[in-house]
Each structure stands twice: as C-alpha cells, then as structure tokens.
C-alpha cells in the first residue's frame, strides 16, 4: 500500500500517513494508483455537491468546486497557471518560455486562466442533473490517467520531479485503467467514452506546440481534461444512462 499512500500524498491534501523519502522510481510505481485517487477525490466532490443540491444548485456547485480545489491543494491549477503565463509571455519572445515557466510568481495570464476554468467548472457542475453526479469520480479518474499517458509518451523538456518519473510509468497500467474506465463510462456516462480523444488531443498539442512535456504541462492537462469532460457531460446530459 506504499504506492497508494504516496499517490494520495502527492496528489491530495487528505490526512494519510506520509512517505518521507521516495525516489522517481517510487513515484512512477505509485502512478498506477493515480486514477483510483481521482475516483476517491471525485466521490467526495460529488457527495459535497449532492448534500447541498436540494437547497441550491449554484451553491452546491460552488461548494463542490471549493472541495475539489481544497482536496487537491490546487496542485493542477498551479501547473495550469504556470503554463498560461509561459505561453502568454513567450508569444512574441519564444526564448522566454522556460524562464517564465520556472518563475514561482503567478502573472496576469495565469490568474485569468484560473478564474475562467473555475467559473466553467462551477457552471458545468450546476447544470448537471443530480443523478449525473456519479460521473464526477470518472472525470477525475480519466484526467489522472491522462498524466500517465502524457508522462509515458512525451519527452521531458526539463529535469524535474514531474518529468523524471514519466518514462518509468508501466505502460500496462495505462491499458488496464483505460479498459476499466471505458467500461464504467459506457455503463454510467456514455459521453465520457470520448475521454481518450481529449487526452490524446492534449498530448498532440503539447507535442506540436512545445515538443514535449513538463510537470506543469501534466498539471495543466489535468485541468483541461476535467473541464472539457465536465462541460461535455453537462451539455449532453440527455445522453446519460445513469440508473436512478
């Protein structure tokens, strides 16, 4: 269970016994648990939203997204903000990309991007029918599976913890989790069967635009995938087959 504990420690703020010393190899092994962590965090988000939904759907959505951000420690939002700042600042000066990406301060592009992503999540969560909340854990699991795929298939652009473990991720786990999540999506939320397309599209964009990935690119990909899938389900809720 060391791998699961490390995955929870790395991806969430949940109070679990920590793993004090670990290597990139340990982190790569723990990656097999990332989608399960997504299912766990997504279940808590869905429960928070469900608990308040009977009073006010907008309030429930806001509290659900707040729980979402708190549980993950805004880890992936930080990566999204860093990537947005780097892309914005290097629009006219490409050589500035990595310098801005490594800057710990959040700039205008990062703030605006975070605000828009959070607003989109709140709006989409508020639109979901109450019985469609079962799709939220699947969305978070798909997004974390994306980190395994991008880390495995894309070359690292710089040396960092998020980059070093990528090539060591066991490819078999990607296949296993893809089959599990496709089966669950087909049974509960058919629109989520498009998740592999979203994951592949983000990977293709990173390859074409940057030539590879960094840890921030993985975090940004989680946010993009979550937001895209949540919007997809919210806008196609008539296609849901979730049993009542």
Can you describe what each PLM-predicted range is?
Residues 1-73, 89-96, 103-244:
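Hydrophobic alpha-helical transmembrane segments
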């Amino acid at each position: 269970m060391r791998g699961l504990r490390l995955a929870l420690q790395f991806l969430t703020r949940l109070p679990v016994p920590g793993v004090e010393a670990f290597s990139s190899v340990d982190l790569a092994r723990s990656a097999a648990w990332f989608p399960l962590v997504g299912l766990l965090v997504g279940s808590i988000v869905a429960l928070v939203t469900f608990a308040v939904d009977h009073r006010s759907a907008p309030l429930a959505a806001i509290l659900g997204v707040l729980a979402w951000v708190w549980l993950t420690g805004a880890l992936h939002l930080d990566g999204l903000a860093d990537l947005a700042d780097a892309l914005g600042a290097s629009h006219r000066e490409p050589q500035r990309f990595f310098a801005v990406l490594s800057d710990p301060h959040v700039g205008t592009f990062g703030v605006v991007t975070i605000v828009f992503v959070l607003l989109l999540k709140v709006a989409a969560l508020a639109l979901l029918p109450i019985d469609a909340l079962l799709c939220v854990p699947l969305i978070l699991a798909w997004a974390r599976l994306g980190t395994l795929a991008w880390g495995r298939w894309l070359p690292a652009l710089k040396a960092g913890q998020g980059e070093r473990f990528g090539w060591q991720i066991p490819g078999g786990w990607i296949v296993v989790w893809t089959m599990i999540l496709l089966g669950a999506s087909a049974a509960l939320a058919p629109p989520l069967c498009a998740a592999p397309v979203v994951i592949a599209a983000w990977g293709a964009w990173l390859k074409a635009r940057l030539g590879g990935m960094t840890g921030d690119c993985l975090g940004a990909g989680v946010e993009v995938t979550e937001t895209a899938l949540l919007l997809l389900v919210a806008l196609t809720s008539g296609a849901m087959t979730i049993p009542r």
